[in-house]
């Protein structure tokens, strides 16, 4: 297999010839060509050369500068954040390099304990580690209750000069409902302290398929044909 990742490099006007040449090389060596993680424009370039396109899911990206809890659509989130703040929870935002090394063992223990016995099912783009000295530019978001106990944490990896992508999300079973939403909202509010403007909240695989399944009242088994229908399309 010849697996490409992302859009072709260079001038978009040259993408067509780049894809054509790549497919020619793949045929010469008997490789099955495939691409993952392309934009709409990139998908069109590959489709124009005869490749099929499958939508695998959606990436939720927040414009931190424009993020607001106002408006009717944000009412559930706004209520959750108010509830958590009334419970006395405070949120701290800092780069990993600003964390005292003595704090990391406790943070790592909490993250592992809150995961429980469930296996780690992270994404291929996830670091799979927490507190490594090499990750100093990562962003740590912590929620601390009125007694000073840690009840939630998020870790984001750098994404370009002013972005961050969610890498780890953990909350205590005893944390008030809405603590995760509160951490995200507070990170947007404190964005300038860590120089962020965009936040990726990670990737939802087959979101449209499962949304359609919910609309149709489909259970896990009856959703499968819907998934395959989308794959064939």
Indicate where each model-derived feature is located.
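A conserved beta-strand-loop-helix scaffold within acyl/acetyltransferase catalytic domains
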Residues: 1, 37-47, 51, 68-72, ...
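Soluble catalytic regions of membrane-associated enzymes that act on cell-envelope
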Residues: 1-74, 78, 187
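A short, structural micro-pattern
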Residues: 54-56, 85, 195
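Short, conserved catalytic or adaptor-binding loops enriched in Gly and charged residues
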Residues: 80-86
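Acidic, Ser/Thr-rich peripheral helices and adjacent loops at domain boundaries
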Residues: 212-228
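Conserved small/polar residues in nucleotide/adenosyl-binding loops
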Residues: 229-233
């Amino acid at each position: 297999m010849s697996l490409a990742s992302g859009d072709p490099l260079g001038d978009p006007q040259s993408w067509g010839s780049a894809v054509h040449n790549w497919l020619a090389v793949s045929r010469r060596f008997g490789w099955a060509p495939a691409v993952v993680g392309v934009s709409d424009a990139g998908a069109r370039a590959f489709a124009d050369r005869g490749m099929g396109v499958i939508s695998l899911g959606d990436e939720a990206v927040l414009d931190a500068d424009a993020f607001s809890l106002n408006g009717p659509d944000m009412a559930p989130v706004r209520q959750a954040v108010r509830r958590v703040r009334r419970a006395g929870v405070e949120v701290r935002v800092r780069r990993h390099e600003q964390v005292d090394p003595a704090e990391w063992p406790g943070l790592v223990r909490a993250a592992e304990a809150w995961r429980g016995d469930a296996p780690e099912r992270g994404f291929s783009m996830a670091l799979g580690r927490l507190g490594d000295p090499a990750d100093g530019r990562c962003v740590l978001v912590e929620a601390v209750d009125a007694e000073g106990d840690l009840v939630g944490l998020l870790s984001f990896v750098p994404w370009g000069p002013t972005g961050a992508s969610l890498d780890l999300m953990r909350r205590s079973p005893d944390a008030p409902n809405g603590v995760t939403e509160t951490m995200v909202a507070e990170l947007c509010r404190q964005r300038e302290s860590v120089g962020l403007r965009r936040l990726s909240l990670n990737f939802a695989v087959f979101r449209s398929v499962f949304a359609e399944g919910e609309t149709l009242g489909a259970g896990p088994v009856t959703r499968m044909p819907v998934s395959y229908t989308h794959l064939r399309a």
